[in-house]
Amino acid sequence: MVERGFIVAGARILKRTWQIYVAHVFLFAIYIAEIAYVASSFENPLYVEEMNALDFLKTQDVTIMQALLLKFKPANMDVLPLYIVLLMMFPFALWLLIRNASLALAISVALYVLTWEFGWNFASYPSGHWFFNPFAWQLLFVFGAWCALGGAARLAPALRSPVTVWLAIAYLVFAFGVTLTWYFPRLAFLIPHWLGEWMYPI
């Protein structure tokens, strides 16, 4: 990336964005066709509703346009739209990352915090918001690029610290405990009420 320059890197990112968008459109068409076929074959309209495809079958013309705008997403088709939006935004972040990686990371963290504070998100069709919020998930993209541009070397001493290792172990134990409550509801009392409200749905 650094050797070829920002223009080439940005063009490649946008090209990949277009490829993923086209793939998403094809997957959407196949997915909707399969849902319609299964629903008609087994005469189960509830299946269409569960897959979040009921609006498409009622108003195809409007819903197709909303799907092309990445606003309408059937069940389990949230990931590629998120990736498309993040890749579209990334060339702008890349421009700043090359010049001042730490500043770019700071802006990314600030955007993440403001997203939580003000509830920023993209609107979905026919109602609601994106399940995977691009304003929040952008932090992973920027952090990964920051690490690749030298940030990982700066973090190395902290990552090798015994304190970090024990914090990671404590987190794994906590996550294991939370997971156990899903399979053994009697253990749900171990999760504080305020923590459960903050954490779910996940």
Annotate each language-model stretch with its function.
Residues 1-202:
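Alpha-helical transmembrane segments and their immediate juxtamembrane cytosolic regions
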